[in-house]
Amino acid sequence: DYYASRGLGDVYKRQVYKKPKLMNNVPMHYCPGCSHGVVHKLVAEVIEEMGMEDKTVGVCPVGCSVFAYRYLDIDWSEAAHGRAPAVATAIKRVWPDRLVFTYQGDGDMACIGSAETLHALNRGEHITMIFINNAIYGMTGGQMAPTTLIGQKTVTCPYGRDPKIHGWNLNITELASHLKGTRYVTRQSVDTVASIRQAKKAIRKAFEANMAGKGSCLIEIVATCNTGWKLSPVKANEWMRENMFKEYIKGDMKDTLDQEIPEL
């Protein structure tokens, strides 16, 4: 062909991207432009690269990620709303050689499951919690979430979140960073190529720490909900950068993985 005749065949036929093998070839129920699909891919890639395909258990609760088990070909356990950390704790304690993680939204982790979240982290359970923060209840129609920004409009606060009425937005990741059981707490995003690469590094770091028995890890992904926000995917990313990143500042909040856990 044209390229082969010019000695360029190998260059143009080289594979530069492929779908992770753990990603099932099925349509996703997520809205087009949503951040969930990208994060799913990163989780699948990290599990494959670690060679943990047959030794990983994910826990997905109620929320947009309720059907996560359809998309990643690993073992999954469904949990009641907010109870993913409790279920993950049990699985990890029974199977300490397994990589165990939860995949939760802001309503599940920071509202109905805040007790399970904070106590599992404070105990230092050897699990990773992946927290998708899009500041809204996406699955149920766009209601106010614990992480909804001050002034942000939702169907349950149509005039904007007012701290005098609705209280302040909850920064549960920052709160988690002060718990003695947490070893690695970070906030990332997946809105650019660079941020996607950084988020993947964070996921790998947390998973490896859990397998080494180094305590609890929490990875917040500041995400978009273009349907709930009533914006196009492009505009949603712009809004996130202009508003979410000011309140939920990206970066590592805690990293004590190089320190030994005190012996009793």
Place the predicted regions along the sequence by residue.
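Single conserved hydrophobic/aromatic residue that forms the stacking wall/gate
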Residues: 1-12
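Flexible, low-complexity linker and terminal segments
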Residues: 10-16, 20, 25, 211-264
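Conserved thiamine diphosphate
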Residues: 18, 145-212
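Active-site diphosphate/adenylate-binding microenvironment
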Residues: 19-80
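Glycine-rich beta-alpha junction loops
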Residues: 62-64, 134-136, 192, 221-228
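Thiamine diphosphate
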Residues: 62-138, 201-205
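Short, hinge-like loop/turn segments at secondary-structure boundaries
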Residues: 74-77, 120, 145-149, 235-238
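Active-site-proximal loop->helix
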Residues: 114-119, 139-153
